[in-house]
């Protein structure tokens, strides 16, 4: 049971999402949600973020690579985690009320809805629009605006939940690192000894024993794998 109830029957057409996002953000920024009868639960269910809203057309680009790179620049790998997946993963982990819990790229705070103690939640997010929504929905949480690469946690964590930005290249040309791998490294710095990392990543992450050998060895040094499983192919379908 979360702080807000998920509307399982709600379906928002893609063409309406951007307009709804903008209206919600305006009401939150201007403290007018109550004036128009909009509840936090309404916002929890309706605000969807940037994923899929790039507005680009494949035919305007010379090749598919240029198209996907332009999409990345706009979306920054952002696709909010579906509420049912967050609820399921939190139920699997069963965090205790005293646990210090992080999400290092929290979006609008989808995992937070199902955590036991709002004031024990910490994290950072680079999208200011999402930050404003998350801070509105979870006012007792310790939520910062900023880049994960510059984030300095104030406490060691018991659990890190995460759905890192997909397929972004961070680091340098000489030492590139995927956004997913960077998230793992940052989580390792944040967690206490014996802490738990609960992560959503593409199936391609660390899937090649040859080309990913170094990263696989580093992950094996930092973490002990407890369990992994695949989500349905349409789990992030808009």
What are these model-derived regions, one by one?
Residues 2-70:
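Long recognition/docking surfaces used for binding and targeting
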Residues 24, 28, 69-71, 80, ...:
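Conserved short hydrophobic patches within well-ordered secondary structure
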Residues 57-62, 103-105, 186-189:
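Short hydrophobic/aromatic-rich motifs at helix boundaries and adjacent loops
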Residues 73-171, 181-182, 202:
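Conserved S-adenosyl-L-methionine
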Residues 128, 176-235:
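Conserved Class I SAM-dependent methyltransferase catalytic core
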Residues 163, 233-238:
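Short, intrinsically disordered, charge-balanced linker/junction segments flanking boundaries
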Residues 167-170, 207-209, 237-238:
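Switch/connector loops and helix/strand junctions flanking conserved nucleotide-binding motifs
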């Amino acid at each position: 049971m979360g702080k807000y109830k998920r509307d399982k029957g709600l379906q928002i057409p893609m063409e309406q999402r951007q307009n709804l996002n903008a209206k919600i953000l305006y009401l939150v920024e201007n403290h007018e949600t109550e004036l128009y009868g909009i509840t936090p639960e309404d916002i929890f269910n309706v605000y969807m973020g940037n994923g899929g809203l790039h507005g680009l057309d494949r035919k305007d680009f010379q090749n598919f690579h240029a198209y996907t790179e332009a999409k990345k620049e706009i979306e920054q790998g952002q696709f909010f985690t579906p509420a049912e997946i967050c609820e399921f993963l939190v139920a699997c982990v069963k965090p205790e009320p005293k646990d210090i819990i992080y999400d290092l790229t929290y979006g609008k705070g989808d995992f937070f809805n199902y955590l036991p103690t709002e004031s024990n939640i910490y994290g950072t997010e680079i999208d200011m629009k999402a930050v404003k929504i998350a801070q509105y929905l979870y006012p007792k949480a310790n939520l910062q605006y900023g880049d994960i690469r510059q984030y300095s946690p104030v406490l060691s964590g018991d659990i890190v939940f995460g759905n890192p930005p997909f397929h972004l290249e961070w680091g340098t040309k000489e030492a590139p690192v995927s956004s997913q791998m960077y998230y793992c490294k940052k989580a390792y710095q944040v967690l206490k000894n014996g802490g738990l990392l609960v992560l959503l990543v593409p199936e391609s992450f660390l899937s090649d024993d040859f080309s990913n050998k170094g990263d696989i060895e580093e992950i094996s040094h930092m973490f002990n794998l407890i369990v992994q499983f695949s989500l349905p192919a349409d789990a992030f379908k808009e």
